[in-house]
Structures are given as structure tokens and as C-alpha cells.
Amino acid sequence: MSQLTEIVEQALAAIEGTDDLKALDEIRVDYLGKKGKITDMMKMMGKLSPAEKPAFGQAVNQAKQAVQKHLSERVEGLKAAELQATLAAESIDVTLPGRRIDNGGLHPVTRTIERIETFFGELGFSVKEGPEIEDDFHNFDALNISEHHPARADHDTFYFNPKVMLRTQTSGVQIRTMENEKPPLRIISPGRVYRNDYDQTHTPMFHQVEGLLVAENVNFAELKGILHDFLRNFFEEDLQVRFRPSYFPFTEPSAEVDVMGKNGKWLEVLGCGMVHPNVLRSVGIDPEKYSGFAFGMGVERLSMLRYGVNDLRSFFENDLRFLKQFK
């Protein structure tokens, strides 16, 4: 019996002395296998008297059970520790910041349009839109642009046929508004316009905002005051502004508006004037009773000046290196 006790103690010590699952399986075979040390003890049964056999057999079985139990507990413990180590290695630290999703930003042209709409909206101007495919009446005739005016030439205008074209300005929106609504009117009309031109400062498609005010007793001083305030608000500077006499078929008198640049040179930013009586007559408004003023500005031109962009084409190339500057 002392030999059996010694074998059990050796087995338990071997089990406790290893952290390797493969080694534990080898210990199981060495002690509990068919040729294992504890199994071999059963061979001694033949040398015992009948009276001793039951007690000895019971002792061997108890030894087997003790070693098997200790072995199972050790295997389970090691597997649990191995699992915990694996989970710890694969765990996610929820305190770490997540992956940032890049947010989009408004295009500089969109920003400029919104600034213009906000300013004139505070003055009571509503925003009107119209078709980009226009007929010659709304694009030319109603605006007092004669049949032989250079603006009607093929090299300036994209024609579908002699009477239908891509609009060259958003003035057609003003004509449609005056046809359908009665004065007093205060509107701005932002939108895309098209001209057959492409270089560093021109593109075939660009954005324009035109404004119109028609009411009784409207004068040029009001136009100057509004545009003065607009330019100073838009550029957020107390700019020098000048009005130069000019010519547009749809306004009389007409002027072009310049601002003083940082380089000390005048920069043209928009055109304006008092609505020509012929334009009012073309939409059934009495020019003896009503007068008005109109103005128009290129959105890309204003964006270039505000953001210091040198090439107009940058706005249309979808270069993220350029666009990310305006987030």
C-alpha cells in the first residue's frame, strides 16, 4: 500500500509541476494508461490473499480517481487560463478613440451663394429660380438685346436651335417673375449659366446671381447704397468701392462696380443699373409709374477674390487637396 501511496504522490506532484497540456496528457498515460504505473498495481492482486484483495482493489480505484480528478482539474485550469490570455490579446480597448469619419464640407461656390442669399434675404429679397434651357424672348428679346447684338453670336452662346439655347444669364428669371407677379418686387436669382468660353478666368458653365428691385420711385442712390453694403459685408472689410459708367442693353444708366484690391489695383466685381424702360414694357409694367434697378455678379469671380484663388478652373476639378481648404 505504501508503494501505491508513493506513486499517487509522484503523479500529483508531476501534475502540479507542469503548465503544458501535452505534458499533462503524457502524465495521464504514464499513470493511468494500460501500461501505467497505477494500472500495473492491479497485477499485485494475484499475490494477495482473498481477504486482502477487496481492500487493495478499492485502494487502487481510489488512487486512480484521485489522480484523474486532479488531472482533469489541472487541464481545465490551464485551458481556462489559455482562453483568458487569448481573449485579453484580442480584446478591444473601448476607451480608445474610434476611427474618424471624414466629414464633407460645402463647396466654396456654394458658400458664396449662401452668403449672397443671406445678405439679400435680410433686406427682403426672395430667391427665384428658372429654367437653364431658355427661349430667345426671355434670354434676349425681353432684355432689350437686339437681334444683331454680339451676345447672340454662336461663339458666345450654346444654341439648340435659333430660338432655344442654354441661358447666358439668369436675367430670364427676372423676366418670368415680372410676367407673373406685380410690383413691388425684390428678388435675386442664383443659378448656372453657360457661355462658349474657356480659359484661366472663364469656363463654359459658371454661376451667377442677379438681383432685381421694381417699385415706385426707385433711384440709383438706393442701388449704390445696397451694393456698397453688400460688398463690405461679403468681404468683411471696409473696402473702397467705385461705380464706373458702362453700357448694358437692359439697364440705363448702367455701371460696373470695382473694389480696391490688396495690390492697390481696382478689381471689377459686378455690373448694375436702372432697369431700362423697354424691359419693363416687354413684361407689361408701366415705366411711367414704376422704376427699378438690377445687378448681376459672377459667383466664381467673387469666390476667387474672397478666398484668394488664382485659377477659376480649380472650382470644377474636384481636387480634394483644394476643396479640403474650405471645410
From Swiss-Prot:
UniProt KW Transport keyword:
no
Intrachain S-S bonds: none
Which parts of the sequence bind Mg(2+)? Answer: E252
Q: Which GO terms describe its cellular component?
A: cytoplasm
The UniProt entry, under CDD domains, shows:
PheRS_alpha_core (cd00496)
Give the main EC class.
Answer: ligase
* Keywords of this entry: Aminoacyl-tRNA synthetase, ATP-binding, Cytoplasm, Ligase, Magnesium, Metal-binding, Nucleotide-binding, Protein biosynthesis
What PROSITE patterns is this protein classified in? Answer: AA_TRNA_LIGASE_II (PS50862)
State the compartments where it is located.
Cytoplasm
| GO terms, biological process | phenylalanyl-tRNA aminoacylation
**Per its Swiss-Prot or TrEMBL entry, what cofactor is needed?**
Mg(2+)
Q: EC number(s) on record?
A: 6.1.1.20
Which reaction is this enzyme known to catalyze?
tRNA(Phe) + L-phenylalanine + ATP = L-phenylalanyl-tRNA(Phe) + AMP + diphosphate + H(+)
The annotation note on the cofactor reads:
Binds 2 magnesium ions per tetramer.
Give GO MF terms, alphabetically.
Answer: ATP binding; magnesium ion binding; phenylalanine-tRNA ligase activity; tRNA binding
Q: What binding partners and quaternary form does the record give?
A: Tetramer of two alpha and two beta subunits.
Give the family this protein belongs to, as stated in its UniProt record: Belongs to the class-II aminoacyl-tRNA synthetase family. Phe-tRNA synthetase alpha subunit type 1 subfamily.
User: What is the protein's name according to its record?
Assistant: Phenylalanine--tRNA ligase alpha subunit
- Which species is this record about? Shewanella woodyi (strain ATCC 51908 / MS32)
